[in-house]
């Protein structure tokens, strides 16, 4: 969702380690067809609660992200809940919108246009 180009694996792994070390974080593995297809979680960042998900490329377009986010929203009842998605990640933005998130604002982050969507209820 956020901008982690494949060449920036160390930054992504550092981000994941921080989330897993955060006692406020809620994380889940997304399993389908007997295998792991991705992960989803939420955490605190600068006084806001953020949510993010990652689906393996081989599993895109199968509805796993939408199903996982809908189920996750029943687990994490924090509101408002924010999600950051880069402009070119149309699929993730559609998942968020299907689950009730609305655009809060857009801004350039490190030369990438990023949208922040929010779920308030």
Task: Describe these PLM feature segments.
Residues 1-58, 70-71, 75-84, 88, ...:
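GNAT-family acyltransferases
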Residues 66, 88-105:
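Conserved active-site alpha-helix within GNAT-family acetyltransferase domains
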């Amino acid at each position: 969702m956020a901008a982690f180009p494949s060449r920036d694996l160390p930054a992504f792994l550092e981000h994941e380690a921080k989330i897993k070390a955060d006692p406020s974080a809620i994380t889940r593995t997304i399993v389908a067809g007997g295998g792991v297809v991705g992960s989803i979680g939420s955490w605190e960042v600068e006084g806001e609660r953020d949510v993010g998900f990652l689906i393996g490329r081989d599993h895109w377009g199968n509805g796993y992200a939408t199903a996982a986010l809908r189920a996750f929203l029943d687990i994490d009842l924090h509101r408002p809940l924010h999600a950051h998605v880069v402009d070119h990640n149309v699929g993730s933005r559609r998942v968020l919108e299907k689950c009730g998130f609305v655009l809060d604002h857009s801004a350039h982050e490190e030369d990438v246009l990023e949208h922040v969507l929010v779920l308030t209820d």
